[in-house]
Each structure stands twice: as C-alpha cells, then as structure tokens.
Amino acid sequence: MKNYQMIVDAQKCVGCHACEVACKQEFKAPLGYFRTMTMYLDSGTFPKVKRDFLPLMCRQCDDALCLKACTKGAISKENGIVKIDESKCTGCKDCIKACSIGAIYVNPFTNIAEKCNLCEHRLEEGLQTACEATCVANAITIVTDKKDIPKEAKPFKNHKDDKPGTLHIGANEKMKNKLTFGRSFSPLNYEIENWAVDHE
C-alpha cells in the first residue's frame, strides 16, 4: 500500500498562485473558498526588501487534530491522506476550529467540509496532483518512498500538537504568526495590507 507524502519547496515558489487556480478548477471550489492558498510575507526596508512565499494546504497530519475533533466519525487517514467522508459529515465545523492553519472550509452549497485530499482520484490513476502538475517552479512534489524525501524537508508546525505529514523546505517560520485556528483559507478572512507584512 502506497503512503503519499507532499514536499513543498518554499524556496522555489514564485507566488504565481497557479496551484490555487488548478485546485479550484479541479474541485470546483465555491467563489471565495480555497483548498490551497499561497501566503506571502514582506520583510526588510527599501532598498533591501524581500518577499517569501508559502503554499499551504491540508498537511495530512498524523494523529490529525481535525480527525480527533470530528464527533461524526467523518474524518479518517489512509495512504497518508486525511479524508472526509461526505456521507457522514454534517457541516458542524468542529474540524475547522481544530485545524491550526485553516485548511478546511464548509461548502455553503452542500454544507459538507472540504479540504485538500492530495487529489486522491488523480493519484489512483497514476497522475500528478493538480497543483504539482501546474506548478511552473516545480515547488510541489508527491513522494511514496522515504528515500525520496530531501534531508532539508521538515514539518511546518503551527501548534505544538501538530504532526504534519506534508514537509516544507525553506519555509519562513514568521508566517506562523499569520495563521489562526478556525480561519479558513479565503481572501475574505485575510486583510492583505495587514497579514502580508512583517510588522516586527
């Protein structure tokens, strides 16, 4: 049985948002809702300024907080993928409150929780995930063999109890200050002029 794991190289990401668009198109996510979001952080002062990017999606956590929070038994993990059973989900939003990076939303039309599932339907057909296939910078990779994990890849933890399956390379740790429990990926939830800038 394959165990899928995503590697995100933030050092390669150019912030083009192609992964977000590909994901929305693949899953027909409602307007204003995202399974994937590329965050960015500006730092420095003119003329020495820098912008870091960080593609974020469900990190397919081990012992996932959302799984433990779901009282309906709608969330499970198999093959390295944290899955939501649509037939059991009631849209109660307990999983949203539990996720430390806001990777889950409830579809307003179906009242069912949705998030990244590593494009499981594509992987089963031997295809790349929509985001990996679309990334122009080759910043996203899915591996099934531990030997293929770069030594510099590590979990991007936003909470002490997080156990991300997805690993990041070169992620700016200050971006953790921009993430909040229970706030789903959406431009409606983030004021760009505030969360994009490092005020420290």
Regions found by a protein language model. Name each.
Residues 1-200:
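Non-ligating segments of multi-cofactor redox enzymes
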